[in-house]
């Protein structure tokens, strides 16, 4: 087992420094802890015959999971002690999605790694990442025996992940889709609405046993039209003086990410319309075959702003400013520095 004491001490000191700075901020300012890309479960590697059948040693996996849990415990303790911290946000990719041992095994490792979040006295808001469905096997031709039972569906994510952690009273979900992974949360005293977007809103159909029974090679990285409809007509309808903060696993669109984001251009136009107090419209056909037109109309009477857009996925720290939409976008590096490695498939091929 590795000796992480020096690194752990540095992390704890850094959190204490941040906490002191947060204490000095005005009580009206929104503050939160953002953790992303923990990638806790096993990495699938090739054997001597080039087959993807070899997993890391169990001690290596346990060491990584314990380290992630220790760092989250420090974060939770800081949040619990500091009244100025409003919530903890998790930016997705809690797993690697290469595991052929089945989704229950993956979920078990996930639960072990993020268990300290259950002790948070502040709401825990979790976004869904492109690794969180355990479906990379279906993107890799070297794993011909991939099983649909391994796939983590939207229902699993809601019932076996997000529902296990301290929720936020008054979360705003899309009542048209029971298992939506996007939602909003209001900081009423600070007149700010937090919007958690889902960059993997592909909605694979599943049977009564929770097994995917439809097309596997769906467009995975996307904001569905229904999600963007919800964004315009539900999420971005807070009182006129409310500010907004967006949290997601990925950035707005392909201009920010290495992947093509279906619906990303529409999201950018919605944000542009809000920031400029103008209008934008788009149409789509819903699951019932009905043609829907969405009118995003943001009048001059709105005084609130979109403060910034926070995301992970890139495994790097970055601060981006998009002049066309007058928006700061902040990328946070991964908690697990080896996160996302492995001999898996690529979303770029989908």
Predicted region positions:
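N-terminal active-site segment of His-dependent metallophosphoesterases
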Residues: 1-104
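A short linear-motif detector with a strong N-terminal bias
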Residues: 7-14, 67-68, 104-105, 172-175, ...
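Extended active-site neighborhood of metal-dependent phosphoesterases/phosphodiesterases
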Residues: 10-20, 54-59, 99-230, 269-270, ...
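His/acidic metal-ligating clusters that form di-metal
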Residues: 18, 70, 74-87, 118-120, ...
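Residue-level marker for buried hydrophobic side chains located in beta-strands
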Residues: 32-34, 89-90, 126, 246, ...
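Active-site glycine-centered loops adjacent to acidic/histidine catalytic or metal-binding residues
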Residues: 37, 92-93, 129-130, 249, ...
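Short active-site segment of divalent metal-dependent hydrolases/proteases
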Residues: 40, 95-96, 132, 252, ...
